[in-house]
């Protein structure tokens, strides 16, 4: 497990959501590609034994996916994961910019990684900056390359299972 990729605040915020084994999930109609988002959820279900249950109303969801034209009034932002407390408890909104970018799948994986409790490899807020060979070894880096395959890396999978399995 790459402890350098664990964000204790994110992990702590997500823990109550995953503790009952079900995550009520909403994918907004603006999101593309929906199939890829469902693949991420299905893979994670099998990996850590969590059921991502689709809900029709976003107000009932604990995890929400959106595509919007402008994120946090920052034209350079392409994605953002926002944890907050709602009437259903701890909740995450994951935003991806609507512009047709070739890295959109990568951004969905990256923001979903935050939901799962992961941080950027270069974050040193908890004194555990990544010293691996390459930050390309994780979707939590900003080192997306157009030739990259769009899926979790071994370091990501090891970190996710280390946090959430047994």
What would you call each of these model-derived segments?
Residues 25-32, 97-99, 145-148:
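Second-shell loop/turn segments in exported
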Residues 1-33, 41-45:
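Disordered inhibitory propeptide/activation segment of secreted metzincin zinc metalloprotease zymogens
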Residues 26, 66, 141:
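Residue-level detector of conserved, well-ordered beta-strand and adjacent loop positions
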Residues 5-11, 58-60, 159-160:
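Short alpha-helical interface patches
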Residues 3-5, 16, 78-85, 129, ...:
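Hydrophobic transmembrane signal anchors and adjacent membrane-proximal interface regions, especially
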Residues 103, 123-166:
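Metalloprotease/metallohydrolase-associated module, dominated by Zn2+-dependent proteases
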Residues 18, 35-135:
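Metzincin-family zinc-dependent endopeptidase catalytic domain
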């Amino acid at each position: 497990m790459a402890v350098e990729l664990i964000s204790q605040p994110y992990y702590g915020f997500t823990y109550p959501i995953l503790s009952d084994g079900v995550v009520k999930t909403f994918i907004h109609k603006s999101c593309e590609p929906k199939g890829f988002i469902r693949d991420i959820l299905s893979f994670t279900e099998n990996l850590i034994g969590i059921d991502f249950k689709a809900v029709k109303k976003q107000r009932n969801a604990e995890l929400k996916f959106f595509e919007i034209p402008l994120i946090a009034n920052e034209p350079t932002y392409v994605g953002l994961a926002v944890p907050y407390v709602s009437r259903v408890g701890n909740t995450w909104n994951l935003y991806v910019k609507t512009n047709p970018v070739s890295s959109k799948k990568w951004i969905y994986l990256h923001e979903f990684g935050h939901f799962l409790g992961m941080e950027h490899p270069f974050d040193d807020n908890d004194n555990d900056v990544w010293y691996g060979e390459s930050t390309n070894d994780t979707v939590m880096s900003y080192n997306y390359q157009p030739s990259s395959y769009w899926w979790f890396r071994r370091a990501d999978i090891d970190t996710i299972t280390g946090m959430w399995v047994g």
